[in-house]
Design a protein with these regions (language model features):
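Active-site-proximal beta-strand/loop segments in catalytic clefts of secreted hydrolases
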Residues: 11, 27, 84-86, 113, ...
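A non-catalytic alpha/beta surface segment that caps or lines the substrate-entry region
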Residues: 1-19
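Extracellular/periplasmic catalytic domains that process cell-envelope and extracellular macromolecules
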Residues: 16-19, 75-76, 103-104, 289-291
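Histidine/acidic-residue-rich, glycine-tolerant segments that coordinate divalent metal ions
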Residues: 6-7, 32-34, 38-50, 56-57, ...
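Residues that mark the start of a beta-strand
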Residues: 20-24, 79
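Non-cysteine beta-strand/loop elements that form the S-adenosyl-L-methionine
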Residues: 24-26, 35, 137, 296-302
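Metal-dependent amide/peptide-bond hydrolase catalytic core
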Residues: 162-342
Length: 342
C-alpha cells in the first residue's frame, strides 16, 4: 500500500446472524530522520534514522494482534482489516489507505499510540477532540541584492522575513478567540549567500495547528494576509504555500465508549484516564474518521526503566515494553467487541 504500507485481513469463519461487521485496526510504521542516542541491543542500525516515536512498538503490537486474531478465526464472524500505515509523520499515509477504498464497508476503525505521560497499565480514552490539525506552510520572500555598505540600494529579504516572523505572532495573541486553541510556529529559516551581501531571497517554513475548522480557516487567511502585506510595506514581494498535512482528530462518541468498556476489562476502571489532555501535535489517523466511526487512544509506556521519561522525537526516547501487552490486548479485544465476540 503506497510506498511501504501493508494491508492484510482476517475473515472470521463463524457463521453470523444477519449482516456481519468489519473493523479496521491501524498501526503507523515510519521512523524519524534523527540519530538514535541510546546504547542498547535494539538501537537503530541506520545512521541518521531511528524510531523515537514508538511506531516500531505500534507495528509489533499489531503484528501480534493479527497473529492472535488469525488463530481465532473460527470463533468470530465478520472481518478484521489491518492497516500497517506508512508516512504518518508527514501526514500522507492514511490518505493513501482511504484512496485505495480500504475503508469501504468498515464499521469501526481503532488506533493507538504510546505515551510517556501515562504509566504502564494506564490508558487514555477521550471522546471528542484529541489532536490538532496540521498545516505546513512555506513562505518565500523576494528582495533586491546589494552590498551591505549600501543597504538603501537593495531590499533586504532577510529583514523582511524577520518582520514576518514577529508579525505572525499576533495571529494567536490578537486575532484568535482566547477560548479557542491555535498555534502558529516557524521552525525553519534561511536567507542570503554571503555575510556582506544584502539578502535577495529568504525562506520560512512553519506550521499552523488548530482544533476547529473555522479557526483553521481564519488563521491561514490571516497568515497569508500578514505575509503579503508585510512584504509589500517593506518593498519586497512574498508568496506563501499552505499544505493540509492532517485534519483535527475528533474521536467518535460511540467508538470511544466501546474502547472504554474494553479497556476496563483489561486494566480496570481506575486506570482509564478520561481527562487525558488534548494535544496540539497532529495525528493523521484523523483522516480516517470522516469515512467511518473510530477512536484513537493513548497507552502508557512510562516506568522506572531509564529513557521512558523522555519525550517523543528525542534521541534517548524509549518505552517499557510491558505497555505493549496492554496495547495488543486492546487491539484484539476491541476487534472482537465490535464483531460481537467478547
Amino acid at each position: 500500500m503506497g510506498e511501504t504500507g501493508v494491508y492484510a485481513r482476517v475473515v472470521g469463519k463463524k457463521v453470523g446472524e444477519g449482516k456481519t461487521k468489519i473493523v479496521a485496526l491501524r498501526a503507523d510504521m515510519d521512523a524519524l530522520g534523527m540519530e538514535d542516542l541510546k546504547n542498547c541491543e535494539y538501537s537503530s542500525q541506520n545512521p541518521g534514522f531511528c524510531h523515537a516515536c514508538g511506531h516500531d512498538g505500534h507495528t509489533a503490537t499489531l503484528l501480534a494482534a493479527a497473529r492472535i486474531l488469525k488463530s481465532m478465526e473460527n470463533d468470530f464472524a465478520g472481518e478484521v482489516r489491518f492497516f500497517f500505515q506508512q508516512a504518518e509523520e508527514i501526514g500522507q499515509g492514511a490518505r493513501q489507505f482511504v484512496a485505495a477504498g480500504l475503508l469501504e464497508g468498515v464499521d469501526r476503525i481503532y488506533g493507538q499510540h504510546v505515551t510517556n505521560t501515562l504509566n504502564v497499565g494506564q490508558v487514555g480514552v477521550v471522546a471528542g477532540p484529541l489532536n490538532a490539525s496540521c498545516d505546513f506552510f512555506r513562505i518565500e520572500v523576494k528582495g533586491k541584492g546589494a552590498h551591505v555598505s549600501m543597504p538603501h540600494k537593495g531590499v533586504d529579504a532577510l529583514y523582511v522575513a524577520s518582520q514576518i516572523v514577529v508579525a505572525v505572532q499576533s495571529i494567536v495573541a490578537r486575532s484568535t478567540d482566547p477560548m479557542e486553541s491555535a498555534v502558529v510556529g516557524i521552525g525553519k529559516a534561511w536567507a542570503g549567500t554571503q555575510y556582506n551581501i544584502v539578502a535577495e531571497e529568504a525562506v520560512l517554513e512553519g506550521t499552523v495547528r488548530t482544533f476547529l475548522p473555522e479557526v483553521r480557516e481564519a488563521t491561514n487567511r490571516r497568515l497569508t494576509d500578514i505575509v503579503e502585506k508585510t512584504a509589500e510595506m517593506l518593498g519586497a514581494k512574498a508568496s506563501i504555500v499552505i499544505k493540509n498535512y492532517s485534519n483535527p482528530l475528533i474521536n467518535d462518541a460511540d467508538a470511544t465508549k466501546e474502547a472504554k468498556l474494553v479497556a476496563q476489562e483489561i486494566v480496570g476502571a481506575e486506570n482509564i484516564i478520561t481527562d487525558y489532555p488534548k494535544s496540539m501535535m497532529a495525528e493523521d489517523f484523523a483522516d480516517y474518521l470522516p469515512h467511518c466511526k473510530g477512536t484513537f487512544v493513548y497507552f502508557g509506556t512510562h516506568s522506572d526503566k531509564p529513557g521512558t521519561d523522555r519525550p517523543n522525537h528525542n534521541g534517548f526516547f524509549d518505552i517499557d515494553e510491558e505497555g505493549l501487552l496492554v496495547a495488543c490486548n486492546m487491539f484484539v479485544r476491541y476487534a472482537l467487541y465490535v464483531l460481537g465476540t467478547k
